[in-house]
Amino acid sequence: YLDFFAGAGTLNYGHNNPLAKEALLSYISKSGISHALDMATTSKIEFIEEIQNTILKPRQLDYRIQFTGPTGTNAIEAALKLARKVKQRSHIVAFTNAYHGHSLGSLALTGNRYYHDEHYGSRNNVSHFPFDGYLGNFDTSILLEKMLADPSSGLPLPAAIVLETIQGEGGIRVATAGWLQRIAAICRKYDILLIIDDIQVGNGRSGCFFSFEFCGLQPDIICLSKAIGGGMPMALLLIRPECDQWQPGQHTGTFRGNNLAFVAGKALLEYWRNSQFQQDVATKSNVVRSALHAIASEYAEHNWDVRGKGLVWGLDVGCGELASAISKAAFHRGLIVETCGAHDQVVKLLPPLTILESELNQGLQILSDSIEEVVLGTHAKSCSTVNPGVDASNNANVVTSLPITFEATQVLI
């Protein structure tokens, strides 16, 4: 299979990447320890040095690193807890169509009603505002600032504003540089921490290592997981020094010292030592952009929308049933893609950053053929508008509902 799902963004460098395999096998063969809680180990020190020297210092970024646990939601929970401690306030601002996780704190930030239907825990102390583009051409940052400036608006002064620069599960909605800069300015004006969730669209997925680089932001806290561990479980925070106000033992967890993730993560961060790697991602991004716009033009009467950047792209076909049918047709042809968006109406593409251009073109051709098969079939007849009754459980990897198995080595990278 060609995998354009990439473990929901965990496998940015492909399945069984040879650099990670070699590093892991060498480490294990030398009896390197797998787990050390939060104690110092050689592999942990080497990972920290790699991220500082290869990622942070070249970008003139000064952050402290906190390992929070194995998954992205652990990073979000730690960021919320720290922001509330630093600012001595409880309220948080999040955005429409946001997705930040399924534990109670991160779930409160998540916009999709479907994820809340079976969870009756507290969702207090979070307000959702319209994301960039949610109200068409209206600048939604104006509404946020208006309510913050008005002491009678009913909006408490928040400890933090949490956002994704590209909403992945929300439908590949890309915030503009101007909007992000205005949100950052609002944070500075009202003494609010800016937390960027770069769990899925960071780690090079947007074309730069951090998704916010293109607009010059310097968030107070950055949440990273998924690909940062080289395909192994890891989550961490990058924290501005003045916000690092934890006292010993205030935020702990058992699985914060996954040495196998340190080894794999360090090996794959080395891609970023070579500027050509980022240029190659930009070239592949243009290939995907051109292919999706060609598909949208071919079916212009359906008014489909193409959104994305780097190697995170979405084709909004306006209907969850249609998008799901395209995903399933592609799978049967050997291409793995998922769906996303409020109604699962977006076909989502996350090819590995390391994919060969020939494989990328092959996958895009499969997608085009699958769309032709579905549109010429019966699905298109019932999908002229967005179907609000779409079961959002399809947001998971579509292959999980099919009775198949495959070895990792069968997936091309």
Regions found by a protein language model. Name each.
Residues 1-394, 398-413:
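Conserved N-terminal phosphate-binding loop of PLP-dependent enzymes in the Aspartate aminotransferase
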